[in-house]
A protein has these predicted regions:
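Short beta-strand/loop element within the Bergerat-fold HATPase_c
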Residues: 139-149
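Conserved catalytic submotifs in the C-terminal HATPase_c
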Residues: 78, 103-112
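Conserved micro-motifs of the catalytic ATP-binding
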Residues: 71-75, 113-116
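A residue-level detector for a conserved hydrophobic packing site
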Residues: 121-125
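Short helix-loop "hinge" at the ATP-lid/N-box region of the Bergerat-fold HATPase_c
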Residues: 131-133
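Short conserved segment of the HATPase_c
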Residues: 161-174
Length: 210
């Protein structure tokens, strides 16, 4: 069983290494083109920057994936004001939502206390918001409320493309072409779900046709 798991992991790493190699090759090509040019090629430099950013994101996802599979992520719970943490976490993304033309409605019930690892929460929250910015359009909503059976953090958004297989979105390396401009490594929601589980929570996905 252990050998089979190792083979599966090696195959997964090979797949994402291929995904990393492609944008890196593109970036390298444009870099060489710019060096040969007698003047600064702004468009080429922009493409270099975009592809190197893609490489950086996929390497980060791969490292996070390895830490999860090796059981290296252990939560350090502390009592805190979860409402404040959520507001603090969303504020840095405000300008990005404006740039994307997405109106974000924030409804956070104040003074919700809980035990939480803020660092792990920041990582999974970044994955969720990045997903909204990448695949969303027009409108999005973030709500935090406390009910009798637990604390509920909900993020909803309109999507650029219809979702075909909702039940597979958290599957390792599965991705759908939900963005008009960006592709995906297929690790974002897989990592997010497992980080939520590390925090002893549950992740639920839902989709409604417009």
């Amino acid at each position: 069983v252990a050998l089979q798991e190792k083979k599966t992991m090696d195959m997964d790493i090979s797949n994402i290494a291929h995904d990393i190699r492609t944008p890196l090759t593109v970036a390298s090509g444009y870099a060489q083109q710019s060096l040969r040019s007698s003047r600064e090629d702004d468009m080429a430099m922009e493409k270099i920057s975009k592809n190197l950013l893609t490489v950086s994101k996929r390497l980060e996802a791969l490292l996070e994936y390895r830490r999860l599979t090796e059981g290296a992520i252990q939560p350090q719970f502390q009592d805190l004001d979860f409402s404040q943490l959520v507001v603090k976490s969303i504020l840095p993304y405000y300008d990005m939502f404006q740039e994307k033309g997405i109106t974000l409605d924030i409804q956070v019930t104040p003074d919700i206390q809980c035990e939480m690892d803020p660092d792990i929460f920041e990582r999974l929250f970044q994955n969720i918001i990045s997903n909204v910015l990448k695949h969303g359009k027009t409108q999005a909503q973030l709500t935090l409320q406390k009910k009798d059976d637990g604390i509920y953090l909900s993020v909803s958004n309109m999507v650029q493309q219809p979702i075909q297989h909702l039940d597979q979105l958290t599957t390792r390396f599965y991705s759908e072409n939900l963005s008009d401009t960006e592709d995906s490594s297929g690790l974002g929601l897989y990592i997010t779900e497992h980080l939520v589980q590390v925090l002893e929570g549950e992740l639920h996905l839902a989709y409604e046709n417009e």
